[in-house]
Amino acid sequence: MPAYRSRTTTHGRNMAGARGLWRATGMKDADFGKPIIAVVNSFTQFVPGHVHLKDLGQLVAREIEQAGGVAKEFNTIAVDDGIAMGHDGMLYSLPSRELIADSVEYMANAHCADGLVCISNCDKITPGMLMAALRLNIPAVFVSGGPMEAGKVKLQGKTKAVDLIDAMVAAADSKVSDEDVKVIERSACPTCGSCSGMFTANSMNCLTEALGLALPGNGSVVATHADRKRLFVEAGHTIVDLVRRYYEQDDASVLPRNVANFKAFENAMTLDIAMGGSTNTVLHLLAAAHEGQVAFTMKDIDRLSRRVPVLCKVAPSVADVHVEDVHRAGGIMGILGELDRAGLIDTSVSTVHAPTMADALERWDIKRSKSEAVRTFYRASPGGIPTQVAFSQERRYDELDADREKGVVRDLEHAFSKDGGLAVLYGNLAQDGCIVKTAGVDASILKFSGPARVFESQDAAVEGILGGKVVAGEVVVIIYEGPRGGPGMQEMLYPTSYLKSMGLGKACALVTDGRFSGGSSGLSIGHLSPEAAEGGNIGLVRTGDLIAIDIPNRSITLEVSDEELAKRRASEEAKGDAAWQATGRKRNVSTALQAYAALTTSAARGAVREVKRRSN
């Protein structure tokens, strides 16, 4: 029987000092026999997805204590990728994932916590906490702050749903008036919550449902709706039950590595492909699998991408569908239900809220559930009132979207595409692979060939696109923006948005060793591995070189002879210490970022750190 970790600090004569300190936090004699649960919050006023979380940690804490545990809350950092976008602030986004994972490990291990409730929401926070939970392998439950409501704007007599990406594209489009830009800007992000499309934050919160570590609705019910409060309440009770099952009943099945096992990672990636999730999820799932010692790799993602269809299309892949609409269609359990009927997922895996995924779907899939409460839950709708307050409205749709032929979520027979929403491409330009969000690529450019236009930074690419240096038919190549070369592997949301605003969204491709925001769409191919800073062939591309992209056949080819590439490589390596570095940019790289660059690995491995372990 495993011993409660917390008893290291709460039991025994020699722990009198530690108990004295625990007492100073409010603990009483009776509390020293209870499990201590870490409530990992990520409240900050910098991020709309986290601005409403301040009191929610204490909501969970109260429920933990009512269920017989002791709750102790702490905070992690949280970076807003949208605010950090387009300047050197984006260098810090991906590295913050490692800091978040480390901070959770430090706090949980330093204080010997018995379990975790992870309150996350935005882009790197959910992945960082997921990595920590799998690294620590103590009972854990995830609950997110929830999606933002989509904005509504009336232009030219028509009302349309808008989001952050619409504001960015409109601002860069000279044909849109200043007044219209201002109207869109003021409407794009109306409430607290993670940005309203199937961007990285919402994608990851959806995937925690598929991994079995979060409660149904975690990824889809909007932050403002009263129904989301139930998730926080249930998380508090659920974690105490899981902790007792592990420490008192020796039930190791509840541990994160046994819940989020290889089959669960396959399920999560299958969901991601079916809903056209953010390409960043590939990076984060690989990193989480690494922490959980799960042998899940790019090869598995490639294999799954070849057999999973697109059953759901959400912004930015389509303009008028947001995560709130997915919730009305049955949420993530609705999509998983269709994948189950198609024989594409393994429902024998366990979850933190049901013995198996099959049991969970029996209750939560609206196409099979007999529960009126479940159907009512999935009718939770946006309130339509700007607010930063969680659980502030109780509006509901009159009816569910259960149409699997033409609705937001489709069945296999009526799939948007038989080919999946994400694909892994290989070739001499990406020997270890690269990622494209096929759900956001127009069918007319699934095969594309054109001359390269090379830039050594995102900033230079933006200047080139807006300055008219990029023309239709070209492949924009942005190099030295990978995990090590950036460092930090910046998101390229501005270049993709500006290609759209310049009328080149369907006329150009963009290829980079950096990554893309979940808000990016178009023929945007990222994560090229090996990256330029590691000596990858992408660092040998020259303006004018022909690049051929063939998504149906999963290939990306630099049409330059092996002999010429060898000459270029020899010339580069002759530079010695100055080799494989950007020469045409000035960038202030802090000590913190230099430390990250020294330890990080390629995108094909999730950009995890590689540290030589000392033998003790």
UniProtKB/Swiss-Prot annotation:
Q: What does this protein do?
A: Functions in the biosynthesis of branched-chain amino acids. Catalyzes the dehydration of (2R,3R)-2,3-dihydroxy-3-methylpentanoate (2,3-dihydroxy-3-methylvalerate) into 2-oxo-3-methylpentanoate (2-oxo-3-methylvalerate) and of (2R)-2,3-dihydroxy-3-methylbutanoate (2,3-dihydroxyisovalerate) into 2-oxo-3-methylbutanoate (2-oxoisovalerate), the penultimate precursor to L-isoleucine and L-valine, respectively.
Q: How does it assemble?
A: Homodimer.
Q: Which family does it belong to?
A: Belongs to the IlvD/Edd family.
Please report the organism this UniProt entry assigns to the protein: Bradyrhizobium diazoefficiens (strain JCM 10833 / BCRC 13528 / IAM 13628 / NBRC 14792 / USDA 110)
According to its UniProt entry, one GO biological process term is: isoleucine biosynthetic process
Named from the GO MF annotations, one term is: dihydroxy-acid dehydratase activity
Task: Spell out which residues are annotated as carrying N6-carboxylysine.
Answer: K124
User: Which keywords does UniProt give here?
Assistant: 2Fe-2S, Amino-acid biosynthesis, Branched-chain amino acid biosynthesis, Iron, Iron-sulfur, Lyase, Magnesium, Metal-binding
Indicate the residues that form the catalytic site: S517
This protein's gene is called ilvD1
Question: What is the protein's given name?
Answer: Dihydroxy-acid dehydratase 1
Q: Does the keyword Lyase apply?
A: yes
Question: Gene3D superfamilies from the entry?
Answer: IlvD/EDD C-terminal domain-like
Question: Which Pfam family is one of those matched by this entry?
Answer: ILV_EDD_C
Q: How is the cofactor bound?
A: Binds 1 [2Fe-2S] cluster per subunit. This cluster acts as a Lewis acid cofactor.
Q: List the disulfide bonds.
A: none
Q: Top-level EC class, please?
A: lyase
Q: Which GO terms describe its cellular component?
A: cytosol
Q: In which pathway does it act?
A: Amino-acid biosynthesis; L-isoleucine biosynthesis; L-isoleucine from 2-oxobutanoate: step 3/4; Amino-acid biosynthesis; L-valine biosynthesis; L-valine from pyruvate: step 3/4
Q: Which InterPro entries match?
A: Dihydro-acid_dehy_C, DihydroxyA_deHydtase, DiOHA_6PGluconate_deHydtase_CS, ILV_EDD_C, ILV_EDD_N, IlvD/EDD_N
EC number(s) on file:
4.2.1.9
